């Protein structure tokens, strides 16, 4: 059959990224406590991950390659074929391998893949010991030109209490949920759980899925005794990441969903570290 995609295109324009977007696909990711975790990710293809315990999940995946000006189109089916050949074992360890295969099979100079998935941790309430699953949105994003560039991104819900409100009020202080988004480049493998714990320790308090009354008392009092601006959160996290020699680049952003204002509070730090 005639291969239309390989026909010559006369507009003489390169395409930076072309491929498949929004594939929902079951994957297995490493779980530090349980072993592997199976999850569902939304995948955009580019590549790399390791092994321990495992958790199954569903990912949303995007996979792209560049398209030179002299080709009319790319072969979309090959992206999914490459994904299927890895039999759900998409991870940081084989991310680079998948990117290399994309470049080879699609005759491309560059490849890019994004895998976004919910990651679950069974979290224990601080006093009662009640347990409940917490969901964290994670993304593995990688590109391959001459070499592989891999970024891990994690979103962590937190609770914050306003230092100014506490200082000026006779009773209580305004508090709210917030979200911290961390992106990392690194030399060796990083655990999702370790980054989540680092972030949660830098907020006024953790967020939990299950709390009994004694837990609520503990959480609200802890937040009151540990007030934080968004500026405090990003600075504290940046200090910790800056001390980690495994991290080569990071960005940290904190956003508070303000409870008494008609806007959110926001802060951002980015740092390229010397290798």
Give a label for each model feature.
Residues 1-275:
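N-terminal intrinsically disordered, cationic/polar leader segments
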């Amino acid at each position: 059959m005639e291969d239309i995609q390989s026909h010559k295109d006369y507009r003489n324009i390169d395409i930076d990224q072309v491929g498949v977007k929004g594939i929902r696909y079951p994957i297995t990711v490493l779980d530090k406590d349980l072993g592997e975790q199976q999850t569902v990710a939304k995948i955009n293809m580019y590549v790399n991950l390791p092994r321990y315990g495992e958790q199954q999940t569903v990912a949303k995946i995007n996979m792209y390659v560049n398209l030179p000006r002299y080709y009319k189109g790319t072969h979309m089916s090959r992206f999914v074929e490459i994904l299927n050949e890895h039999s759900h074992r998409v991870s940081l360890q084989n991310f680079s391998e998948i990117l290399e295969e994309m470049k080879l099979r699609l005759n491309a100079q560059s490849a890019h893949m994004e895998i976004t998935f919910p990651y679950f941790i069974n979290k224990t309430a601080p006093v009662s010991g009640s347990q409940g699953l917490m969901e964290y949105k994670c993304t593995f994003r990688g590109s391959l030109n001459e070499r592989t560039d891999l970024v891990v991104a994690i979103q962590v819900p937190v609770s914050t209490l306003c230092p100014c409100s506490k200082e000026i009020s006779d009773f209580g202080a305004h508090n709210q949920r917030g979200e911290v988004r961390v992106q990392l480049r690194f030399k060796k493998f990083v655990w999702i759980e370790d980054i989540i714990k680092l972030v949660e320790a830098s907020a006024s308090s953790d967020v939990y899925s299950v709390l009994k009354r004694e837990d609520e008392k503990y959480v609200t009092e802890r937040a009151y005794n540990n007030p934080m601006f968004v500026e405090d959160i990003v600075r504290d996290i940046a200090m910790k990441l800056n001390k980690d020699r495994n991290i080569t680049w990071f960005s940290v952003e904190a956003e508070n969903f303000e409870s008494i204002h008609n806007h959110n509070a926001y802060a951002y730090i980015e740092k390229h570290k010397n290798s």
